[in-house]
Regions:
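Lectin-like carbohydrate-binding module/patch detector with strong preference for beta-trefoil
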Residues: 1-167
Length: 167
């Protein structure tokens, strides 16, 4: 989450992985093969800005609601990679301008079968889960079943882990 921001509307951006809680996301079952993607640091979930459904709508964090803009499907893409498809928009998480530099904004876009839309989900190592994590926001509720993951974006052999830190 950009600048470790705990407020609603904070941007979700790409950043080199540093093993920090603000770079870790939980996939919380929402039924029907859908998930809410909750940030470990803020307790807020990935959401579509202003419930937008058009190409280029930014992905940000927001307190959990019942809205479909916060529900995602994990779509197998082969080679150990997945796409994250939003239920409301029927579009996948993508990176603005197909960039992989630190600070690149996450957005949704129609599935164009591009590398910039592929993600690798890695379990968070137990040693990181055991680190003291800041208390979640009051809006966060403890889900019945979650999977903690870190996401990784690879391009041209250089790895940049998905994060939310922006400077």
């Amino acid at each position: 989450v950009a600048d470790f921001n705990t407020e609603n509307g904070a941007s979700v951006r790409l950043w080199s992985y540093e093993g920090q809680p603000w770079q870790q996301w939980q996939f919380v079952e929402a039924g029907d093969g859908e998930y809410r993607i909750r940030n470990r640091f803020t307790g807020k979930v990935m959401d579509l800005a202003m419930s937008g459904v058009c190409n280029g709508t930014w992905v940000h964090q927001w307190s959990q609601t019942a809205g479909a803009g916060q529900r995602w499907q994990i779509v197998e893409a082969g080679g150990g990679k997945v796409k994250l498809r939003n239920v409301l928009a029927d579009k996948v998480i993508d990176l603005v301008g197909m960039r992989v530099e630190n600070g690149t904004q996450a957005q949704i876009w129609q599935d164009v079968f591009g590398e910039n839309q592929l993600w690798k989900l890695d379990p968070v190592p137990e040693r990181l889960l055991n680190k003291e994590t800041p208390a979640p926001t009051p809006a966060a509720k403890k889900p019945a079943k979650t999977t903690r993951t870190q996401t990784e974006k690879k391009n041209s052999g250089k790895a940049a882990r998905r994060s939310s830190k922006n400077k």
